[in-house]
Amino acid sequence: MNVYSVIKKPHVTEKASLGSDATNTVTIVVDRDANKIEIKQAVETLFKVKVDSVRTVNVAGKVKRFGRNFGKHSNWKKAFVTLSEGQSLDFFEV
């Protein structure tokens, strides 16, 4: 899988920001077909940081109503990437 197609976007929530402060962990939305090895290689290549571990979660899409009709958001995959000591990753740096 191409390195640029593995990482989709950062998953920025209040809970994710608390985890990043305490354990040096970054939460990222990744491609559903990507495995932990591909995610680790993509983060290390694109952001020039050292990764200690990667944990992944398959998140089920929610059922939503669109007027009278029911629809479903797509399933997606979330990765918790733990960076090495002294490494940092800030998505909002310019």
From Swiss-Prot:
Pfam families: Ribosomal_L23 (PF00276). Keywords: Ribonucleoprotein, Ribosomal protein, RNA-binding, rRNA-binding. One of the early assembly proteins it binds 23S rRNA. One of the proteins that surrounds the polypeptide exit tunnel on the outside of the ribosome. Forms the main docking site for trigger factor binding to the ribosome. GO terms for cellular component: ribonucleoprotein complex; ribosome. HAMAP family: Ribosomal_uL23_B. One of its GO terms (biological process) is translation. PANTHER family: 60S RIBOSOMAL PROTEIN L23A. This is Large ribosomal subunit protein uL23. Belongs to the universal ribosomal protein uL23 family. InterPro entries: Nucleotide-bd_a/b_plait_sf, Ribosomal_uL23-like, Ribosomal_uL23/eL15/eS24_sf, Ribosomal_uL23_CS. Part of the 50S ribosomal subunit. Contacts protein L29, and trigger factor when it is bound to the ribosome. PROSITE patterns: RIBOSOMAL_L23 (PS00050).
